[in-house]
């Protein structure tokens, strides 16, 4: 009796797994449909981003290069093949090698 009951429960469980599931509303399908809708009608969904990124380079003939006011240093380059540098205070490049003949700071600003 116990074996029959156990077998019956296993069969019922397996049958439930075999029942087709409605996959029309999975999160993947919903996202895919929304992306297609946005791409098909770009005029209906204007961009909320109105800022532009402007960048410039500042080169000095020493170990330090500072960005103009309001700009942030995003990267540095150093002369004499020095690959060791750091950004200090968010707007100044400092080359860390002993011998450096120039420093360039890449400065950017969102406006």
Swiss-Prot record:
The keyword Secreted applies. Residues 1-23 form the signal peptide. GO terms for biological process: response to nematode; response to selenium ion. GO terms for cellular component: extracellular region. Keywords: Disulfide bond, Hormone, Secreted, Signal. InterPro entries: RELM (IPR009714), Resistin-like_sf (IPR036262). GO terms for molecular function: hormone activity. Pfam families: Resistin. Its main location: secreted. It is found in: Secreted. CDD domains: RELM. Disulfide bonds join 55-108, 67-107, 76-93, 78-95, 82-97. Highest levels in adipose tissue. Monomer. Probable hormone. Plays a role in pulmonary vascular remodeling. Belongs to the resistin/FIZZ family. This is Resistin-like alpha. It comes from Mus musculus (Mouse).
């Amino acid at each position: 009796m116990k074996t029959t009951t156990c077998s019956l429960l296993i069969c019922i469980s397996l049958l439930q797994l075999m029942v087709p599931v409605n996959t029309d509303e999975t999160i993947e399908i919903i996202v895919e449909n929304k992306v297609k809708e946005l791409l098909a009608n770009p005029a209906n969904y204007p961009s909320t981003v109105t800022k532009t990124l402007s960048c410039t380079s500042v080169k000095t003939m020493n170990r330090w290069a500072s960005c103009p006011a309001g700009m942030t240093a995003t990267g540095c380059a150093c002369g004499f093949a020095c690959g060791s540098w750091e950004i200090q205070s968010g707007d100044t490049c400092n080359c860390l090698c002993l011998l450096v003949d120039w420093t360039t700071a890449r400065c950017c600003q969102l406006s």
